[in-house]
Structure formats: C-alpha cells, structure tokens
Amino acid sequence: MLYLTKISNAGSEFTENEQKIADFLQANVSELQSVSSRQMAKQLGISQSSIVKFAQKLGAQGFTELRMALIGEYSASREKTNTTALHLHSSITSDDSLEVIARKLNREKELALEQTCALFDYARLQKIIEVISKAPFIQITGLGGSALVGRDLSFKLMKIGYRVACEADTHVQATVSQALKKGDVQIAISYSGSKKEIVLCAEAARKQGATVIAITSLADSPLRRLAHFTLDTVSGETEWRSSSMSTRTAQNSVTDLLFVGLVQLNDVASLKMIQRSSELTQRLK
C-alpha cells in the first residue's frame, strides 16, 4: 500500500487535525526516522490518539507502522529518482526530443500502474467481480477518455456473454440509467468523480435499486459517495497533456482485471465464447 499516494490524494476527506498530520508527514517524510508520535502531537497541538487514529484510517495498525512504511516509500522513490533524474522529469516540455518524451510517457504509465495496483483491496475486488457476474444487465458510463475505457470493457464483457450497454450519448446514458432494476449493475468510470452527467446517471441507477460501481480517483467526490463499491485509480497528469494518458492506463488496468476475474469465474464457458467470437471474426477476413 502506497501511503504517500493515499495521503496526497485523499486531502478533501481529512478533518482539520488530520490535514495537519498529513501536511506534516508530507513535509517531513525525509526526517521521520527520528520523529515520535509524542513529538508530532506536541508540535501540531493535537493529541497522540489523533495521530494513531489517522494512521488507522489509512490502513496501518498504528503510527509506528505508518512511519516505517513512509520511510520505506521515500527511500524507494529516491532510488528511482536517482536513476532517472537526468532524463525523466515529471513533465514534458516543448524542447523534449521524441526519445525523451517516449521515456517520460513510459515512466508515467509505469507509475500509474504501480500506484493503482498497490492500492487494490483484493477482497473487495473479488466481491465486485461476484456482483457483476450475477447481474442480469450491466450499464457502463463515462465521458471522453473514460468513455473509451468503458467501451473497451463493454466489448470484452459482451464477448463472454454479458448483456451490456455502453452508449456515448449522455442523454441515452441517462435514459438507460433510469430503466435499471435491482440486481443490475452500473459501472461508472470517472477519474474526477464530479462530472455532472456521470453523477446524474449514478443517482438514477441507485434510485432504481441497481448496484453502482465507481472506477475513480482517491479524492472525495459525488460519485464516490454515491457508489456502493469503488475501485481506486492513481494518475499524475501534467500541463503538457492533450489527453489523459496515464489516467486511461490506470483505468484500463482495473477494467482488464475485472474482465480476467470474470473469465476465471466461469472459465470453460467464457473460453468457449471467446473461441467462437474469434472464429466468427476470422470468417470476415
């Protein structure tokens, strides 16, 4: 679990005291080896129990476990930075050669994958896969780049026998949402979790008794609050981006994992359908 990533992405979810702790940890991560919870509490003007509760909120058993994990993450990131600092900065500039751009893009996508996979709650993921597998009907919603991810997932799911709707038109998305029933599933893909169209569809789906699964960022958002289940994605986009490249990479890693998990649940039948699909498309050549 990448605690530094969770701290930096979950700021809006923190209380005032929790934000003080988060800011302190981020600003002093290189010096945490010599910091105790008592020292932190005194410096921040809060109780030691607040620090312990903060650590537990992030998934650690206590402050000591969180502190050691942060030290380890910081050391690992320093090692990676030292090996790539000359060429792989955090943003692409107008002066970069295509070779440097390629290396930066690859590194950014690698980080998106590493950080997203590190945040997976695999027990929750298994539960989500089971819920999807039992759904009579699945709707997938998304806008822009997220819509492309959704369309790819819809094709994969249809290939193994699921009834899926993934419409590009937002009015049609809303119309489908209000017609969902209990047992149906809506998979809402939105990194920000705040797009009006996606939130509206999630509200409609939930009102009808459907299960809402959100593929979104760690930040608090209307979609995150509406969803029955969330699958977290991490991405660092920069100013020289005409498209959300690393975001799509992170989202695709989640949707591909869902697909493979569903294939595993019913492997014999799924593989037969994949084979039949391949045979049919071969006849079109």
Swiss-Prot record:
Gene Ontology BP, a term: carbohydrate derivative metabolic process
Role description: Represses the expression of the murPQ operon involved in the uptake and degradation of N-acetylmuramic acid (MurNAc). Binds to two adjacent inverted repeats within the operator region. MurNAc 6-phosphate, the substrate of MurQ, is the specific inducer that weakens binding of MurR to the operator.
PANTHER family assigned to the protein according to its UniProt record, in alphabetical order: GLUCOKINASE, HTH-TYPE TRANSCRIPTIONAL REGULATOR MURR
Source species, domain of life: Bacteria
Molecular function per GO: carbohydrate derivative binding; DNA binding; DNA-binding transcription factor activity
Region forming the signal peptide: none
Domain (SIS): residue spans on this chain: 128-279
Recorded metabolic or biological pathway in which this protein acts: Amino-sugar metabolism; N-acetylmuramate degradation [regulation]
Complex and partners: Homotetramer.
Keyword set, alphabetical order: Carbohydrate metabolism, DNA-binding, Repressor, Transcription, Transcription regulation
Domain (HTH rpiR-type) ranges: 1-77
Gene designation: murR
PROSITE patterns linked: HTH_RPIR (PS51071), SIS (PS51464)
Protein name: HTH-type transcriptional regulator MurR
Taxonomic classification: Bacteria, Pseudomonadati, Pseudomonadota, Gammaproteobacteria, Enterobacterales
DNA-binding region as annotated in the record: 37-56
